[in-house]
Amino acid sequence: MIQQETYLNVADNSGAKKLLCIRVLGGSNRRYGSVGDVIIATVKDATPNMAVKKSDVVRAVIVRTRKSIRRESGMSIRFDDNAAVLINQDGNPRGTRVFGPVARELRDKNFTKIVSLAPEVL
């Protein structure tokens, strides 16, 4: 459950380390985002000499949340952190690697490139 002012870790090698959520996309009055939702965020911490700099405004897709996700089968899944992967306007990841597990719900939302780069899909 990600909302405005939520801090997220970055799960790729684009150069950003921490993000601050500015907006959850998908409706004028949308309050919360979950796995697979696109957010607008600002970079709060970044690696030097990379493409993404501190204070850049970026798009990202949420890949892990601390809030548990209910599945159709009745199972629920929860992660240890809130994390996102930076994407461009086309929905493709800006980095070339994805770190840590990602949720299977990303495949349903057509983020197949992120799913294929991830080391583990839960």
Curated annotation (Swiss-Prot):
GO biological-process terms attached to the record: translation
Arranged from A to Z, the UniProt key words for this protein are: Ribonucleoprotein, Ribosomal protein, RNA-binding, rRNA-binding
Q: Which GO terms describe its molecular function?
A: large ribosomal subunit rRNA binding; structural constituent of ribosome
Database matches in CDD domains: Ribosomal_uL14
Q: What's one Pfam family here?
A: Ribosomal_L14
Assembly information from the UniProt record: Part of the 50S ribosomal subunit. Forms a cluster with proteins L3 and L19. In the 70S ribosome, L14 and L19 interact and together make contacts with the 16S rRNA in bridges B5 and B8.
Q: What is this protein called?
A: Large ribosomal subunit protein uL14
Native organism: Thermosynechococcus vestitus (strain NIES-2133 / IAM M-273 / BP-1)
Give the gene that encodes this protein.
rplN
